[in-house]
Amino acid sequence: MVDFTKVAEEVRKESAAVELTAVSKTKSLEDIMEAYRQGARVFGENRVQEICEKFSSGRPSDMKVYLIGQLQSNKVKKAVSLVDRIESVDSIKLLEKIGKEAEKIDKTIEVLLEFNSSGEEQKSGFRSEEELAEACRFSLSLSHVKLLGLMTVGPLGHDEEKNREAFLKTRRLFDSLKPIYGFSVLSMGMSGDWKTAIECGSTEVRIGTAIFGGRS
């Protein structure tokens, strides 16, 4: 049972300015179109192959698709051609490849840099503020990449205080870089922690289970 409307209302109560991305990974195109009919316009997908299967034959002109999962370098070309934004850029090498592929097809691609705010070994993302700042500087040399801001995933386990600590750390970093690079997007918060993320300054939350139900 798809219920985008209810979740959108809950998010709006917390902040009317926050963008709600419907995480549609593993969900059918039928479910995605039902969410679209209920007002969803931004969808988050984890895998490039799945994006190909769902959207290669087209989609409504006002529907946006964001890649939110890890991107392997051999999938960059396909990803750049299919999505509006890549939210999981975790290395300068990947950023450079995205820039090259976007330039080849003369497409400006939006990106977010992923920050590993919790320092967990099993997570991807830039681990230090210095590395992340270097990636920001490098992005200025890429004519077809539009760096919009940062993304982070809260610590495993849904401990509210640990989530808050990680989100506030990312928010401080975002605030320090915003005046230099014109950042506008701080993507933090998923189904279990989005309210805390909004309290900490998130401008985009990514919610799947509450909209689409459990895994298909």
List each model region and its residues.
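Expand to "…catalyze enediolate/carbanion chemistry for C-C bond making/breaking, isomerization
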Residues: 195-199, 207, 211-216
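Conserved, well-ordered active-site substructure
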Residues: 204
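Conserved alpha/beta-domain cores
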Residues: 1-192, 198-200
